A protein has these predicted regions:
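C-terminal beta-signal and adjacent terminal beta-strands/loops
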Residues: 19, 30, 135-138, 194-207, ...
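Short loop/turn motifs that connect adjacent beta-strands in outer-membrane beta-barrel proteins
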Residues: 16-17, 50-60, 64-69, 103-105, ...
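Outer-membrane beta-barrel channels and translocator barrels
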Residues: 3, 15, 107, 119-122, ...
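Transmembrane beta-strands of outer-membrane beta-barrel proteins
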Residues: 8, 18-22, 112, 118-120, ...
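Residue-level signature of outer-membrane beta-barrel architecture
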Residues: 12-14, 116-118, 186-188, 197, ...
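Flexible glycine-rich, low-complexity coil/linker segments exposed to the extracellular/periplasmic environment
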Residues: 41-107, 144-174, 185, 283
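C-terminal beta-barrel architecture of Gram-negative outer-membrane proteins
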Residues: 127-235, 260
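Outer-membrane beta-barrel signature, preferentially recognizing the C-terminal barrel domain
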Residues: 1-21, 95-110, 117, 173-178, ...
């Protein structure tokens, strides 16, 4: 991979304890390393089989990454494949999806940060907000990607068969266009607490987009975590120990439903539900 990165930003401190940052950035990466994808491999296999027709069926294998069972002898004898105009093939055993240099990727966006600290008689408070916004996420097809794109543009591959991984990728398949993180902390003496919120924007799942353009939208998801700390000393050596009780996903938010393994989009979400932990640390 080779990439060109550009960023520009500024920092403001309008009042004591308040800092505001803003950064605009762009990344252009050539020969991006990634997976071609099982779906793309099977579509590419289909394209090669239709293009080959019934020529050299004894040696033709289609896309070698798509490993198939032997064709059903009954279907061959009944002439189904001959009627369809393709060489006989069986069901897919597995797809060997290895990492490749695929395409040129361009990503542009900006980040906003707000940091505020204030000391009061009730304790010390700190607020941290970071918002990330993506304006552009595009991938120009190369290699097999380019072949698939050309065939779909020519009508050889139906428009309602999704080809993933090139074109405008923003807002689809886990590529949400915004993410917000807010953290509020409090401390007074030996006690401390925090509230953290994480929100990821919505996106659509291309594999469930219908031929009339109707999108299957995966809604945004917001998760809150809560912690309470207590610091104390062991053998009179100062506050060298800390115990923390935490609640992860305090509102028990579940991941939005998606057409993926386990029923949610694991590249973007987790689905652990509300969970707890206790952490004990000692500095010697």
């Amino acid at each position: 991979e080779e990439s060109d990165n550009t960023s520009v930003g500024f920092v403001l401190t309008p009042v004591d304890g308040l800092t505001i940052t803003a950064d605009y950035w762009t990344i252009e990466k050539e020969n991006t390393i990634g997976l071609f994808g099982r779906n793309n491999h099977t579509v590419y296999d289909m394209m090669l089989r239709w293009a080959n027709g019934t020529n050299n069926c004894g040696s033709f294998v289609g896309n070698p990454a798509v490993v198939r069972e032997a064709p059903d002898s009954g279907d061959v004898e009944d002439g189904y494949f001959a009627t369809a105009g393709v060489c006989p093939f069986g069901t897919i055993k597995y797809v060997g999806d290895n990492y490749l240099n695929l395409a040129t990727r361009t990503i542009e966006g900006y980040d906003i940060g707000i940091y505020y600290d204030v000391d009061t008689d009730f304790g010390d408070f700190a607020v941290r907000y970071i918002g990330s916004f993506i304006d552009k996420f595009e991938q120009t097809p190369g290699g097999e990607f380019a072949a698939l794109a050309a065939q779909q543009a020519a009508g050889a591959i139906p428009a309602d068969i999704p080809i993933d991984g090139f074109g405008d990728l923003l807002g689809q398949n886990g590529n949400y266009d915004e993410k917000h993180r807010l953290r509020v902390t409090w401390s007074k003496g030996s006690w401390g607490a925090s509230l953290t919120g994480l929100r990821k924007g919505d996106f659509y799942q291309s594999s469930l987009t219908t031929s009339d353009g109707t999108l299957f939208v995966i809604p945004s998801m917001t998760v809150f975590d809560v912690t309470v700390d207590y610091k104390f000393s062991i053998k009179g050596s100062g506050n060298n120990a800390r115990i923390r009780f935490a609640v992860k996903n305090a509102a028990d938010e579940r991941a939005p439903t998606a057409d993926r393994y386990y029923g949610y989009f694991a590249d973007a979400h987790t689905d652990l539900g509300r969970n707890f932990y206790v952490d004990f640390r000692v500095s010697l």
